[in-house]
Amino acid sequence: MMAQSKANGSHYALTAIGLGMLVLGVIMAMWNLVPGFSPADKPTSQGNKTEGGGGILKSKTFSVAYVLVGAGMMLLLLAICLSIRDKRRMRQSEELARIQQQAGTVPHSQEEDSQEEEEDVSSRYYVPSYEEVMNTGYPETRGQEQNPRLSISLPSYESLTGLDEATPTSTRAETETSPGHAPDRQNSKLAKRLKPLKVRRIKSEKLHLKDFRITLPDKNVPPPSIEPLTPPPLYDEVQAKAPDARPPD
């Protein structure tokens, strides 16, 4: 801005000087050309001497006027040329600034577009690893791998009750409705294999505690007498019938 203001000031100064010299030269030329204003046209007592001196003075004034007019024209042309040059430089600097701004914005937009395209391609052709595929259905094992201390700590009561509630009761209903139907050994073996060891151990311990609470004997009630389900074998009758069953001699 300072350089531009200085250049404008120099242009104005050259223009003013050129115009002043041009106007002064024109005035001097008009002074000699218009009759009555020149000293040669004024009447004097000395005739020949004044005529010769007036002609010399007239020629000198004309030469000075021509020099002033020429210098003024040159200064004006110089001021015009300098102003045109400065305007061209300003335009070139503005164009360079625009080009730099466009060059700065275009690569940024191209980088954003390229990043978006790469993200789209990676999301389309993304292949999960073996560990991710194997750990998707087993979040508990993943948590144990991340925190090895969890394997040492015991499960909470809420988790145990949730496991009991989450177990399906369809198998119990089937066994109650069809008591005579024998269970399939293969299905039971597969169920035992598929069940985790921890859950099976916790369930067995809880069932044992429940049965113990149910069958807890009272102090006032006498202990129940245990009777066999089937009657004892009749050994006496078999021994008595044995000699009769022998064939006669």
UniProtKB/Swiss-Prot annotation:
GO CC, one annotated term: membrane
Annotated region described as Disordered, given as residue ranges: 95-126, 161-199, 213-249
- Location in the cell: Membrane
Q: Give start-end positions of Basic residues composition bias.
A: 190-199
User: Keyword annotations for this protein?
Assistant: Membrane, Phosphoprotein, Transmembrane, Transmembrane helix
Key word Phosphoprotein present in the record? yes
PTM-bearing positions, type Phosphoserine? S109, S114, S178, S188
Lipid bilayer topology: Multi-pass membrane protein
Please note every region of biased composition (Polar residues).
99-108, 167-178
Q: Where is the composition biased (Pro residues)?
A: 220-234
Transmembrane stretches in the record are 17-37, 64-84
Origin superkingdom: Eukaryota
Predominantly, its location class is membrane
Known InterPro entries for this protein? TMEM51
Q: Which PANTHER family match?
A: TRANSMEMBRANE PROTEIN 51
User: What protein does this entry describe?
Assistant: Transmembrane protein 51
- Source organism per entry reads Mus musculus (Mouse)
